[in-house]
Amino acid sequence: EALHHSAFTVASIMSTTGFSTVDYGQWPMFSQILLVMIMFVGGCAGSTGGGIKVSRIIILVKASLREINSYLHPKSIKKITMEAKPLDNDIIHTTSIYFATFMFLFTVSVMALSFNGMDFITNFTAVAATINNIGPGLELVGPTQNFGIFSLFSKWVLIFHILAGKLELDPLLIL
């Protein structure tokens, strides 16, 4: 039964459905940390699932490994590929800008929510759950709780994150 509940919870978070069969806020901290990490992965490229997207994470990891390799072997030239096709540096740059913008917006929003006096885990996972379109977070916004505890200002911040997660950041930042 525990395997069933944990598999369902992971599938629910990765698919951004927001369903829960158990209060995973009662799980060990290690399991909760893994769930929060899964929140950021989101769907695959082109999906309406929230999160950073698997393809962007792959590009960021490959770009990071290329940079580390260039420090170890300064004269080496390595192209980053996806599906055996080399990626243009503009795509890598755009992905890096997207990730930096995502993390900046995330950090500023967690700080803005901190004015409510809620604990850090509640604020962090509330922003993570909304920008990644997951549904519930942890602590006071866990699967057995709701977002009604936040002030009107904080709710507007979280609404912006729901839109940013569904529509992606680019269209909202252009507006």
Residue ranges and their predicted role:
Residues E1-L175:
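Membrane-proximal intracellular helices of multi-pass ion channels
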